[in-house]
């Protein structure tokens, strides 16, 4: 909450928020860098080591300070559809809350360790996109879907793993 309150102290930020439409996006820096739900922090700067608890607190603050509540179907859920008349549906995704533990992201078969989007969110996206009559359908993702983001020399941080067979989080 303190970080959100700090931003609101800036008059320019408040003016922008009052004048510019915004779709708030949830990612890792609301909690800790590159987090996943089952993570236990080894960083001594944190008195709370459970990332799941930190993420729950961050999620609550996010929804208290960011313009999301109007579209939420379920309290605390980040993924949602934002419609702008008959022309545009924006599908806002959450690539943090449903992901498996960070790994080398090179698994050959789909399994619990390759989760990225989460089965429920994927089913929701498919259903909502099929039911959408909007001319334009935009997926707003907090991480690049098809861009390679290296995590060391051999692993990749997001969903894409480069050329070759489907591996790791690409299964989602």
Question: Where is each model-derived feature located?
Answer:
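Metal-dependent phosphoester/phosphodiester hydrolase catalytic core
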Residues: 1-172
């Amino acid at each position: 909450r303190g970080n959100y309150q700090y931003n609101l102290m800036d008059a320019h930020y408040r003016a922008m928020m009052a004048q510019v439409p915004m779709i708030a996006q949830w990612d890792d820096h609301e909690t800790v860098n590159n987090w996943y739900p089952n993570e236990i922090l080894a960083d001594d700067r944190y008195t709370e080591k459970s990332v799941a608890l930190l993420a729950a607190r961050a999620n609550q603050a996010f929804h208290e300070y960011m313009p999301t509540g109007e579209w939420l179907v379920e309290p605390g859920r980040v993924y949602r559809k934002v419609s702008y008349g008959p022309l545009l549906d924006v599908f806002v995704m959450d690539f943090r809350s449903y992901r498996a533990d960070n790994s080398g992201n090179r698994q050959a078969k789909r399994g619990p360790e390759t989760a990225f989007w989460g089965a429920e969110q994927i089913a929701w996206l498919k259903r909502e996109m099929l039911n959408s009559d909007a001319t334009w359908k935009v997926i707003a993702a907090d991480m690049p879907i098809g861009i390679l983001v290296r995590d060391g020399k051999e692993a990749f941080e997001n969903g894409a793993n480069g050329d070759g067979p489907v591996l790791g989080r690409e299964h989602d």
